[in-house]
Amino acid sequence: MAKTSTSVIAAKTLVHAAALAPIALLGWQFWQVWQGGSDALGADPVAEIEHRTGLWALRFLLITLAITPLRQLTGQAVVIRFRRMLGLYAFFYASVHLAAYLTLDLRGFWTQIFEEILKRPYITVGFAAWLLLMPLAITSTQGWMRRLKRNWGRLHTLIYPIGLLAVLHFWWLVKSDIREPALYAGILAVLLGWRVWKKLSARRTTARRSTPPPATPR
């Protein structure tokens, strides 16, 4: 037990380090650009910051969705311990993505966000995804699981429409080359398709078990 706990702690430390590495690199590059004389973030630093943070939010969302299939395929229940952490990193990067848009793109004129939401569909679905992520992040603790009981599981099924909205946000944002959003859409389709297949398989198994065997003639 102690060995397992130590291994899990070590693994979580590595996951934290890996999850924070992109934002640490981005912060360092932003500092270089801010000081002047660096093109570390390309010709349009604001667009690059928004792109990277949004991309990592989507990646962590998909990795979170991959935890359940991974557990079912490998039989390693320990991977479930990383799901909450990865989901919170998805919310973290999504929040940084939104903050970058509000502060760097809109330059603090936050009241414009409502106009942008109504005018640009990709912002509409992106903002909706972030709003739906918020209650999942807030209720991710053991305390909330005990309070909500069965409703906790129902609430956290919101991650499925959130995934769809996030991919749609990326797809609509890209003007020409849709290969990258198509890749993430394909990954999401596989992850959701796996869940549908497992549920249908479980129903068929239950139906077979509940069907009485045919009566033998006497």
UniProtKB/Swiss-Prot annotation:
<keyword id="KW-0479">Metal-binding</keyword>
<keyword id="KW-0349">Heme</keyword>
<feature type="transmembrane region" description="Helical">
    <location>
        <begin position="121"/>
        <end position="141"/>
    </location>
</feature>
<comment type="similarity">
    <text>Belongs to the MsrQ family.</text>
</comment>
<protein>
    <recommendedName>
        <fullName>Protein-methionine-sulfoxide reductase heme-binding subunit MsrQ</fullName>
    </recommendedName>
</protein>
<feature type="transmembrane region" description="Helical">
    <location>
        <begin position="14"/>
        <end position="34"/>
    </location>
</feature>
<keyword id="KW-0813">Transport</keyword>
<feature type="transmembrane region" description="Helical">
    <location>
        <begin position="86"/>
        <end position="106"/>
    </location>
</feature>
<dbReference type="GO" id="GO:0020037">
    <property type="term" value="F:heme binding"/>
</dbReference>
<keyword id="KW-0812">Transmembrane</keyword>
<dbReference type="GO" id="GO:0030091">
    <property type="term" value="P:protein repair"/>
</dbReference>
<dbReference type="GO" id="GO:0009055">
    <property type="term" value="F:electron transfer activity"/>
</dbReference>
<dbReference type="GO" id="GO:0046872">
    <property type="term" value="F:metal ion binding"/>
</dbReference>
<dbReference type="GO" id="GO:0016679">
    <property type="term" value="F:oxidoreductase activity, acting on diphenols and related substances as donors"/>
</dbReference>
<feature type="transmembrane region" description="Helical">
    <location>
        <begin position="60"/>
        <end position="80"/>
    </location>
</feature>
<dbReference type="GO" id="GO:0010181">
    <property type="term" value="F:FMN binding"/>
</dbReference>
<keyword id="KW-1003">Cell membrane</keyword>
<keyword id="KW-0997">Cell inner membrane</keyword>
<comment type="subunit">
    <text>Heterodimer of a catalytic subunit (MsrP) and a heme-binding subunit (MsrQ).</text>
</comment>
<keyword id="KW-0408">Iron</keyword>
<keyword id="KW-0472">Membrane</keyword>
<dbReference type="Pfam" id="PF01794">
    <property type="entry name" value="Ferric_reduct"/>
</dbReference>
<keyword id="KW-1133">Transmembrane helix</keyword>
<keyword id="KW-0285">Flavoprotein</keyword>
<keyword id="KW-0288">FMN</keyword>
<dbReference type="GO" id="GO:0005886">
    <property type="term" value="C:plasma membrane"/>
</dbReference>
<feature type="transmembrane region" description="Helical">
    <location>
        <begin position="155"/>
        <end position="175"/>
    </location>
</feature>
<dbReference type="InterPro" id="IPR013130">
    <property type="entry name" value="Fe3_Rdtase_TM_dom"/>
</dbReference>
<comment type="function">
    <text>Part of the MsrPQ system that repairs oxidized periplasmic proteins containing methionine sulfoxide residues (Met-O), using respiratory chain electrons. Thus protects these proteins from oxidative-stress damage caused by reactive species of oxygen and chlorine generated by the host defense mechanisms. MsrPQ is essential for the maintenance of envelope integrity under bleach stress, rescuing a wide series of structurally unrelated periplasmic proteins from methionine oxidation.</text>
</comment>
<dbReference type="InterPro" id="IPR022837">
    <property type="entry name" value="MsrQ-like"/>
</dbReference>
<keyword id="KW-0249">Electron transport</keyword>
